[in-house]
Amino acid sequence: MQLNLVVTEAERERLVRLSPTPETGPLLRTLLRLRHDFVIIGRAAASPLPQALQARLEPHSDVGTAIAEFLRASGAALLARRRPPGLDGVESALHSYAAAIDTVRQEGLTRCLPNDVTERFFALCFALEQLRHNLRDLQGCVAEWATSPRQTSDS
């Protein structure tokens, strides 16, 4: 895996003080957890949900956009050694989506679904919650890599 090679080289440079950077392990572990989150989300979303559920969740589909924007801004912050972007957009989108999921559950719309669809629905719910946690960890890693606590992000 190319990421492991890059991390190994970065850690080697850090240890001999050629690069005054934080330890690479936490960032690597966070990126791997995020990768696993996206694999689970991809598997859960591989087949479309029934139309009734899609119609209820569609107004809250800005979750992907908010996460993509946060990841792009985090990558830019890492490269520039700036403070991490805020998570407000992600948190707001995930909160809205979670509220829609709670409403779907309270109304019993998942009770009549086939088992495989129900499993994918709840796997997606779980994966999004894990993703929220791991994005917070990424934000912390980006903060560690920032060169100055006085610098702030544009987000």
Task: Identify the function of each model-found stretch.
Residues 1-31, 71-87:
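Non-transmembrane accessory domains of multi-pass membrane transporters/channels
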Residues 30-153:
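Soluble C-terminal extramembrane regulatory/interaction domains of multi-pass membrane proteins
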